[in-house]
């Protein structure tokens, strides 16, 4: 399930791409598959990186010297890369988990090349507020969401660091009711019939990608997409 749209974040041959907070690898692997690029995934969780490594094995192209894939465990506040290393940076559904997200944004600005592109996604405010209202446990779990962003304020904070915003969209509207159900039945979510049936629907949709649900979600995303996805260009050095 991709949140980032690679038409809005176009990858060019030879690009070095960072997926910050890559989790189990959905975007860093997708970027590698997308073109002849050098993909790097960073996460604090060694367990998630192991899952990413295992998933990547089915996509590896060891004979293609034009592309590479690497993983590293590191803090978003102290990235182990030199200034101006990356052509593209992805940070999807991560900033809401980081206590000092301003520090993470400064690190992103530091490692991104002048003129490079940055994609950030966070949970959309109003669906997220309903999740918080339905269950305290939703945001109190270890590693859970620490804040609810206002997308316009986050955009302004990123622009303040020297970025220009150039695109925005919303994603995953079909997932919103699923998370509301999980929050409503938090204590019994693993056995709740409604939660299980909706999960089956989402798995079917992801595996089969039928036209009906694709059209439905596309029409719903501007209204209730779970994620807001914003794209920025780092200002070139003067």
What positions do the PLM features span?
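Conserved N-terminal segment of class I S-adenosyl-L-methionine
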Residues: 1-82, 88-92, 102-105, 192, ...
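Residues lining the SAM
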Residues: 92-95, 121
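A short glycine-rich, Lys/Arg-flanked "PGG" loop and its adjoining helix->strand segment in the class I
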Residues: 102-117
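Alpha/beta-hydrolase-fold catalytic nucleophile elbow
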Residues: 121-122, 171
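Short, glycine-/aromatic-enriched active-site segment of Class I SAM-dependent methyltransferases
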Residues: 123-147, 155-157
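A SAM-dependent methyltransferase catalytic signature shared across enzymes that methylate proteins
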Residues: 152-169
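Conserved catalytic loop of SAM-dependent methyltransferase domains
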Residues: 167-203, 226-227
């Amino acid at each position: 399930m991709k949140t980032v749209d690679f038409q809005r974040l176009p990858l060019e041959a030879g690009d070095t791409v960072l997926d910050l907070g890559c989790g189990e690898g959905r975007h860093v692997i997708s970027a590698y598959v997308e073109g002849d690029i050098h993909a790097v995934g960073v996460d604090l969780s060694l367990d998630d990186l192991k899952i990413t490594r295992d998933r990547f094995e089915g996509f590896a192209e060891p004979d293609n010297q034009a592309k590479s894939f690497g993983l590293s465990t590191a803090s978003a506040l102290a990235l182990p890369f030199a200034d101006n290393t990356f052509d593209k940076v992805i940070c999807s559904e991560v900033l809401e988990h980081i206590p000092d997200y301003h520090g993470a944004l400064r690190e992103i600005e530091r490692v991104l090349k002048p003129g490079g592109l940055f994609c950030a996604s966070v949970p959309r405010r109003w669906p997220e507020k309903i999740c918080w209202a339905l269950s305290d446990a939703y945001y109190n779990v270890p590693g859970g969401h620490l804040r609810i962003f206002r997308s316009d304020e986050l955009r302004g904070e990123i622009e303040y660091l020297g970025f220009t915003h150039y695109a925005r969209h919303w994603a995953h509207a079909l997932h919103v009711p699923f998370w509301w159900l999980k929050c409503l039945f938090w204590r019994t979510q693993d056995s709740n019939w409604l939660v299980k049936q909706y999960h089956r629907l989402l798995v079917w949709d992801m595996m089969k990608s039928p036209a009906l649900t694709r059209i439905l979600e596309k029409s719903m995303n501007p209204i209730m997409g779970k994620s807001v996805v914003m794209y920025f260009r780092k200002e070139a050095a003067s």
